[in-house]
Each structure stands twice: as C-alpha cells, then as structure tokens.
Swiss-Prot record:
Function: FAD-dependent monooxygenase; part of the gene cluster that mediates the biosynthesis of the immunosuppressants subglutinols, meroterpenoids consisting of an alpha-pyrone (4-hydroxy-5,6-dimethyl-2-pyrone) moiety attached to a decalin core fused to a five-membered cyclic ether carrying a prenylside chain. The first step of the pathway is the synthesis of the alpha-pyrone moiety by the polyketide synthase subA via condensation of one acetyl-CoA starter unit with 3 malonyl-CoA units and 2 methylations.
Record has Flavoprotein as a keyword: yes
Protein name: FAD-dependent monooxygenase subE
Broad enzyme group: oxidoreductase
Residues annotated for FAD binding in this entry: 35, 49, 108, 313
MF GO annotations: FAD binding; monooxygenase activity
Induction line: The subglutinol cluster is highly expressed when mycelia and hyphae are transferred to fresh media for a 3 hour induction period, remaining expressed under conditions of heat shock. The cluster is repressed in cultures reaching stationary phase or in early germinating cultures, as well as under conditions of UV, salt and oxidative stress.
Lineage, top ranks: Eukaryota, Fungi, Dikarya, Ascomycota, Pezizomycotina
Gene: subE
Family named by the database record: Belongs to the paxM FAD-dependent monooxygenase family.
Keyword terms: FAD, Flavoprotein, Monooxygenase, Oxidoreductase
Entries under InterPro entries matching the protein: FAD-bd, FAD/NAD-bd_sf, FAD_mOase_fung
GO BP annotations listed: terpenoid biosynthetic process
PANTHER family: FAD-BINDING DOMAIN-CONTAINING PROTEIN-RELATED, FAD-DEPENDENT MONOOXYGENASE ASQG-RELATED
EC number: 1.-.-.-
Length: 322
C-alpha cells in the first residue's frame, strides 16, 4: 500500500500564506490555500517594504527578480525634524553594501500578484472560502485535520496553518482548544492582554506625481507623528502618516477610522515639503486610494496545538514605529 502524501491546508492567501505555498512546492509537499475574499490581490491602498532578510528568502524561491522589476531600491532618505533641522542619510545604500539586498517598496497588491502568478499550480488556490470549523479526525487508522467552510466545502489534510493575519480565526480555534483541554499546555492568552494598539496609520498611493526621484525617501519626524513619502517608478508615490493615539487601546476597543478621519489627519501636514517645490498636499491631491487603520502590536507565546499552527501577523505583528 502506498503511503499517503502529507498535505498542508493554508488558511489565508496573504503574503505569508502564498510564500509558504511556494516553499512547500519547492520541497514537494502537497497543499491548498483557502482565501475568504474573492481575490488574492485586493487593492487596499497599501505598500509593502522588502528588506534584506525577506529579499533573501524570496530570492531562494526564485521570486526576487520579478520584484526587482517593480520596486526601485531606496538610495537616500531625507529626514526632517520639528526644529527645522534636516539631513540626508545614505543608510539604504549601506544596507545594500552590508547585506547584498536593498530596501525596496512596491504595492502590496503587486507583491501578491507576483507570488500568485509564479505558482505552478493555481488550482490549489481557492477563493471565496471562509473557514467555519476545524476538526481532527481518524479515518482508516489515519489521523488528520479537516477544515469546513461556510460555503459548504470540506478540505482534509495533515496540518492546518493559519496565515490569516491579525484577526486570525485559526488563532481563535487554537486558543479555544487549549482552554478546553486538560493537557499541560499553558492557558491561552487573553487577546486583550496580548494585542495592543498605540498608533494609527493613514496610508495611500498617489499617481502622476511629477518632480520626485524614484528611490529617494522623505521623512518628517514630528512630536507623536511621522510622515513617510516614498517615490517609486512611473511617477507613483507610496506614503503613510503614523500618529500616536491618545492612549493605548486593547484589541477589542481598537479605534476605527473613516475617510473623513484620514482627510482631517492628512490636512494637518499638507504644508510639509517633499522636494523640488512639492508639498504633501500635492501628493494628497493625486491620491488613487487611501486607507486608515489602527496598528496592532503583538508577540504571542502560544503558536500551535495539535495539528494547528499560526504564522505571520496572526501571532507576531510589529507596527511601523517599532
């Protein structure tokens, strides 16, 4: 009798989830990816920075060349302080010299598209699949785990990996099982003690912004507030404005923001200079998409139980100020 092939069920078509899919493919392990949205490349207005540690992994997976084509490397950073002092730092070039890879930014959606397009077998990626229940089972003396979806589908495998982000359902299932178990595991953490919010971030993508040089980042450091503007190729500009909140919030009381909140916050930095006579208001006026979110921070001690494990933001998330 042939041995059954080990199979991994990945919850979440995130950057983490799709990168894991590539890793499993490289070593010949069967897998499926379940994504609750109708696409693995949603437009959320977010950019993503690729640092040398991540670039090295993506290069090993054969993905980095496609990223290089989309993301010009940072070469210099112009940093402004509240007292008017400003200087140009070449730390991005030093990072390239020291580690062999640069810092580079691209649209998060572009990175997801690169990860998805490079997968050899796209039939393993299932969208519109929302996890409902996770079960352990024994069948014909073989044990495993299955995922039931709200859409009525059933997926069976040997390991379930939660790559479903800070609002992870997989993490919730792990904690539920640990709390109901009589094993010697430590009690699962209270989510409000482990996931805290001290900052908000308004972020966006602007297009057709002329006069800025790709790869020359601009930062304005203010008391409790930081604006970062990153010109990219084809007159695209990534930017984000981080603000310290009035207090530290728990996960359950995380502030929610509207487009009016984003506009009100960004209008306070309209006059800040970006370069070549351009002010942030000019970048704002060319915006294509804008979003504003609370920035969660966490580092959880319970990552797994049984055949369930969480990775990425679901168990370890740092905010931009960190």
């Amino acid at each position: 009798m042939s041995q059954r092939q080990f199979k991994v069920i990945i919850i979440g078509g995130s950057v983490t989830g799709l990168t894991l899919a590539h890793s499993l493919h490289k070593i010949g392990i069967d897998y499926v990816v379940l994504e609750k949205r109708d696409t693995v490349t949603p437009q959320e207005g977010a950019s993503i920075g690729i640092l040398p540690n991540g670039a090295r992994i993506l290069d090993q997976l054969g993905l980095y060349e496609a990223i290089e084509d989309e993301a010009p490397p940072l070469g210099a950073t112009r940093i402004h302080f509240p007292d008017g002092f400003a200087f140009t730092s070449l730390y991005p070039k030093k990072i390239l010299e020291n580690f062999g890879y640069p810092i580079a930014f691209l649209e998060r959606r572009q990175l997801l598209r690169i990860l998805y397009d490079a997968l050899p077998d796209k039939t393993r990626i299932h969208v519109n699949k929302t996890m409902s229940t996770i079960e352990h089972f024994t069948k014909d003396e073989i044990t495993g785990a299955r995922v039931l979806t709200k859409e009525g589908d059933v997926y069976e495998g040997d390991l379930i990996v939660g790559a479903d982000g800070i609002h992870s359902q997989t993490r919730g299932e792990i904690w539920r099982r640990i709390n109901s178990s009589k094993s010697e595991f430590e009690p699962a953490e209270c989510i409000d003690k482990c996931i805290l919010i001290e900052y908000s971030c308004c972020f966006g993508i602007s297009k057709c912004v002329t006069g800025l040089i790709a790869g020359e980042q601009v930062m304005h450091m203010r008391n409790g507030r930081t604006l970062v503007v990153i010109p990219s190729k084809d007159e695209v500009v990534f930017w984000f404005l981080v603000e310290k909140l009035d207090r530290k919030y728990t996960y359950s009381e995380a502030p929610r923001f509207t487009i009016d909140d984003a506009t009100a916050l960004c209008s306070q930095v309209f006059t800040l200079p970006i370069g070549n006579g351009i002010k942030f208001e000019d970048v704002w006026n060319k915006r294509e998409v804008v979003n504003m979110l609370s920035l969660e921070e966490s580092c959880l001690s319970t990552w797994s139980t049984g055949r369930l494990v969480c990775i990425g933001d679901s168990i370890h998330k740092v905010s931009i100020p960190s």
